[in-house]
Amino acid sequence: MTSSLPCGQTSLLLQMTERLALSDAHFRRISQLIYQRAGIVLADHKRDMVYNRLVRRLRSLGLTDFGHYLNLLESNQHSGEWQAFINSLTTNLTAFFREAHHFPLLADHARRRSGEYRVWSAAASTGEEPYSIAMTLADTLGTAPGRWKVFASDIDTEVLEKARSGIYRHEELKNLTPQQLQRYFMRGTGPHEGLVRVRQELANYVDFAPLNLLAKQYTVPGPFDAIFCRNVMIYFDQTTQQEILRRFVPLLKPDGLLFAGHSENFSHLERRFTLRGQTVYALSKD
């Protein structure tokens, strides 16, 4: 016995599985638009990634042509689809205590500072970085009110929602000590077995907000004792990198620290930052 789908369902299924054409001209337009909106440089070898991510947007909107999608974007500069476009093309690779050598340096720096110690996580992604910063500061400075604060931002609003929730799979916490896991997380039970959630006592010290590093103004509560901007500059060209670093300067306190990613080098881009350690820069006191 055989059965067949109704004609309309068959057409929809074909639409969902058929590979759409991404022309050179469309790829160039996509590259120009994401550069203008987010500063991200898309090399030619990213073409398949761009297709795989954006085709989901086309299909969710019932579109079968990249040209129609781009026309939809460009016809309304304030459309909510712009945020979905940006969210689709940002890369979010992160982990708790990634580049672990940074956190002892942060702790040592925090011990030697007076007043409220403030940190900005400028590419917070799904929250692992700002919560790692928060755990480090809680272990180092305690949790007395007004002792420290973390501000966390990202251009991708979807990952910020996950960050705010503070919910992770247990295996994502493999870099934490048993003491940190017990002190700062609650284990899920029943239908939430295998999940953990950041305890509210820690989450209260972390504020999340969307922020585009290309924005004309940074709505951040600076100045900060330290800024983490790790593994994001690699997606920008040198002109954009220099502009962002220039704008970081007034947002850092004298002798404040800037933490970079393992493949990033800022020494030649902004003379006011001097290398303090492995991918760690200090703002000159001058």
UniProtKB/Swiss-Prot annotation:
Single GO MF annotation: protein methyltransferase activity
Catalytic class of the enzyme: transferase
This protein's name: Chemotaxis protein methyltransferase
Encoding gene per record: cheR
Catalytic activity, as annotated: L-glutamyl-[protein] + S-adenosyl-L-methionine = [protein]-L-glutamate 5-O-methyl ester + S-adenosyl-L-homocysteine
Source taxon at top rank: Bacteria
Keyword presence, Transferase: yes
Signal peptide (residue range): none
Domain CheR-type methyltransferase, residue spans: 15-286
Binding site for S-adenosyl-L-methionine: 92, 94, 98, 129, 154, 212-213, 230-231
Keywords for this protein: Chemotaxis, Methyltransferase, S-adenosyl-L-methionine, Transferase
Naturally occurring in which organism (per UniProt): Escherichia coli (strain K12)
